[in-house]
Amino acid sequence: MNTNSEDEIFSILKPVETCLAEDDKARLWARIRQDSLRMRAFRRAAVIAVSAAAAIVAGVAIYFTGTWRSAEPQYIQYISEAMPEAGGDIRIETSDKVIEVSSDATVSYHDGYFSVRDSVETKIHDIKKGGDVHQMIVPFGKTACLNLSDGTKMQLNSGTRVIYKAEMNGRSREIYLNGEAFLDVFHDETSPFCVKTDRLDVSVLGTKFNVKAYPSDKQQSIVLVSGKVSVTGNLLEHAYQMKPEQRFCYDGSNCNASLETVDVEDYTCWTEGILRFNGANIKDVLMQLSRYYNARFSCDSTITDISITGKLDLRNGIDAALESISLVSGIKYRNRHSLYEISK
């Protein structure tokens, strides 16, 4: 942070603050702090963009080149980009191949190789080199499981991208995430595990937690099931230490961070094909259905004030899910050329 510029702002304002009421002072300082945080975000984004552009000009591939540490700006830039809305196959990208799986997949890493299992068969692939960096992309409409070489297990929701080392060894374990995942991190006190999004860093030793970080969403959140988690980030004023049954939320629209006690099942039951809502706006509900089923919706303006409370089973298909919503909310829906039109 450029402390000189902030000191200048403070020195300009202090002589006049004596003329302000206490409430006005509080609002003014809050606005200054918010602007300062936004400036940090702008600087970080500028550094990332310049680093990525420099790599392209130099003829260097953004993705599979350089050391893990030196490539961090490129990885952050990569995961900050929204996933394409179109569906497709689940993809595992390595330094020398692209593996596509049409149905929900489980990818497991071992010493020197990794396996890819779908509903039909299991295939074995060699890991070319210990430092190889892989990427797994789960398109909208599909989910997948990823078991890392250190023993950490991940369930990946629709529209999720993960960048990780094929062989996790050394004193630190890191992954880069765009989308949503539930993690059961293998406990290792000598090697912290860190999940990096484009805004936050989540550090643990061994725990179970959910991370939601879709680039198209204003908010990013972490829900802790067990263990301990530390959340940091360039946009945060300080580190947040989480306890089980807490949810941390960062709102990028106003740079606000919050920590609250929640029912963790509301945020993790998607791993079982269930969604639970407590007064959720129907547009937020439809957004989650859009990602899960890779479906398109057109909403009439008359539904914007509808809220949904209850449990929704996703395993019976999109029409069954919409029928359940219709029963509790009174909405009408119809499918016209793969576009669901929603109205009262």
Where does each model-flagged region fall?
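A residue-level detector for the "anchor" residue at the start of short, highly conserved motifs
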Residues: I32, R44-I48, V60-K344
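Membrane-interface anchoring determinants
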Residues: M1-E85
